[in-house]
């Protein structure tokens, strides 16, 4: 057993369960896993083409530490399949696959899961070790408590601590030392990873009731609506996620084979590819599908398919900080970006594929979404000849 896990353990690491991990002890008797990542997919859904996109803000924010430490970030972008020229477009977005690949490149090149943003390096393999420990935990509360104990083994500590009240539970960020995170990416990442990892382990979404941040609403704050799907509070006295206490008793339903598969692909997809099937937003996107060339289903049909009333569905979408019209618009935007990356498709054909009968209307809508025309966006995707 690792030191620091004697209090209510139930979570044990046995190398025989993880024979493929190159385990060696360090000077403190702790487990070190050198060089353990080979890519990322979310929740074992690697083969599914994702139609989700990620704001260029998160691409640039993820690169801040690498730039500060002198890495060639343009080369990192190219390795991830992202043209550096695309980032010149103010409202550019990349596919979730591209963003996931960028996370892999950063961690592999830097050997630091904090990507140069934390108060110290987090060696590649730290997340894998924590996951191997918590898979034997009986329920979500035990997962979060043991994960926090694991994080305390490293100084300065960067972690999330579980606090339990009468009806509510909170995951509260604990960050010691000086962080180099001007764009808040490290803090956002830790919240997202701990929340989505817990949801995966218990096989159900941990429905958030509130997300708090101890900094002013950032310029990219609108993106938070689609990340947390709950009310947001900025300039709070802490960074925390609040949810119903009942989730803490939910049993861990994943087993070691599932975790081994999960660790081949995580945690980058926890950041880039949220399990939106657990939200009304995601369910509506799934019902609409990817064929946007035909008339889309109306709101009443969608509500019936989801076994709810239109009034209730509107209220739930409001709780998720969105609307039916916004879901349709963003789905068209994301699919248009996906098709534009396929250079062989004429732009007029793309307009029809995403539901526009008039190319001029598509051009206006796309410029509203991204700040540039479809043609200019494609040029940015293609990059300069030197790329």
Residue ranges and their predicted role:
Residues 3-171:
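N-terminal low-complexity or simple alpha-helical regulatory segments
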Residues 218, 223-387:
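Extended mid-to-C-terminal alpha-helical interaction segments
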